[in-house]
Amino acid sequence: MISKQEYQAQAAQGYNRIPLVQELLADLDTPLSLYLKLANRPYTYLLESVVGGERFGRYSFIGLPCSHYLKASGKHVDVYQNGEIVEQHDGNPLPFIEAFHNRFKTPEIPSLPRFTGGLVGYFGYETIYNFEHFAHRLKNTTKADPLGTPDILLMLSQELAVIDNLSGKIHLVVYADPSQPDGYERARERLEDIRTQLRQSCAIPLSLGSKHTEAVSEFGEEPFKACVNKIKDYIFAGDCMQVVPSQRMSMEFTDSPLALYRALRTLNPSPYLFYYDFGDFHIVGSSPEILVRRERDDVIVRPIAGTRLRGKTPAEDLANEQDLLSDAKEIAEHVMLIDLGRNDVGRISKTGEVKVTDKMVIEKYSHVMHIVSNVEGRLKDGMTNMDILAATFPAGTLSGAPKVRAMEIIEEVEPSKRGIYGGAVGVWGFNNDMDLAIAIRTAVVKNNTLYVQSGAGVVADSDPASEWQETQNKARAVIRAAQMVQEGLDK
């Protein structure tokens, strides 16, 4: 932990949030047990990662209760402090959010990973209506909104625990406010309070089972197939090459959302595992796909397109992999999305600095395998994170190509707002690094109802029945996780 003198020196350099860090051994705990001890209340989060579908990432992140958060819907933003609105803004929320983020000047913590606090949460799909290059083409008609969640919700994370899964250590991070005369002392006291919480045992919420329920499609199979045929008509007319329609499923779910996260992380380990407690609703997900990642001046997108079910045996798994890589439709769709990714990254990157670093590799998850590629660029001077978001949002894999025309068709054919689905979840650090996953393989739990949404890439030779089945396959991990909870994880 830095000394009072070091703290004062950093304040003199103009930093208005200064991290105090305490390192402890926590090798007898897991990220889940630590979350139960330190957080497990509204406006907290747990972020984990599984690399390559088979090993946990080095770091996990627990956000302690956030006193400040922003909610944006349409052209209005509310800033909350301890549950009360303290600031409001009318107009495009994105410049306001960027200005809010930029209020905080913090020194880096060299011994820790790149994320050590900042804005954490999501940008829902309807964020598209705030980008000027989309707004003039999209109608933004009023649609049914069964979830009723904000378009954007971001927490200001100033107290967190960074878990090093390799060493078994936990780094407690509390940001002090040097504008407060006793800011340093208050942060030290808060660290001691958190240490006390760590020493205490926590009640383990057992999952003993509940009533079994079935998921019901909002769209319905036959209307969805008709939607696929309508999109194919647009494709044959030359309007577009691909569109990704989606359908939402819902089921009664009265169990703990944290139990759902336990089941999902076991069933479908993914690069982005996340649990967000927003009070009146929860987001639980295991997304395999980056929307965009910024690390200093490098930007990365990683398109995923092309899907097969996992095989029941290694031989069947290999056969499915070979079948996927020899499927002309899937390959053509994937190449189109690589080109779209190159175009998106190219808009914000220096000339000649865009490259495909992985091309059409197979990544395997619990229920499905995908074709994946990696596109990287070096940012032009002066690019902001909102410039990056504008260039890459929404993902081509969730919209289609050309992107704007595909989004117009989605607006026409889907019966309700997408909400969180198809948007982005993740972190925007104080250091301006950003890591956002696409909100897929993701459940929203609200009012004892679980919602999960999934899409299928429709091209000229798509079979409507196959595209319907693809939406079922992609939702399967979340629905099966919910059923595992209903059967009882701890029976």
UniProtKB/Swiss-Prot annotation:
Transmembrane segments: none annotated. GO terms for molecular function: anthranilate synthase activity; metal ion binding. Pathway: Amino-acid biosynthesis; L-tryptophan biosynthesis; L-tryptophan from chorismate: step 1/5. GO terms for biological process: L-tryptophan biosynthetic process. It catalyses: chorismate + L-glutamine = anthranilate + pyruvate + L-glutamate + H(+). Feedback inhibited by tryptophan. Its EC number is 4.1.3.27. The keyword Transferase does not apply. Mg(2+) binds at residues 333, 470. Coiled coil: none annotated. Its cofactor is Mg(2+). NCBIfam families: trpE_most (TIGR00564). Heterotetramer consisting of two non-identical subunits: a beta subunit (TrpG) and a large alpha subunit (TrpE). Part of a heterotetrameric complex that catalyzes the two-step biosynthesis of anthranilate, an intermediate in the biosynthesis of L-tryptophan. In the first step, the glutamine-binding beta subunit (TrpG) of anthranilate synthase (AS) provides the glutamine amidotransferase activity which generates ammonia as a substrate that, along with chorismate, is used in the second step, catalyzed by the large alpha subunit of AS (TrpE) to produce anthranilate. In the absence of TrpG, TrpE can synthesize anthranilate directly from chorismate and high concentrations of ammonia. This is Anthranilate synthase component 1. It comes from Neisseria meningitidis serogroup A / serotype 4A (strain DSM 15465 / Z2491).
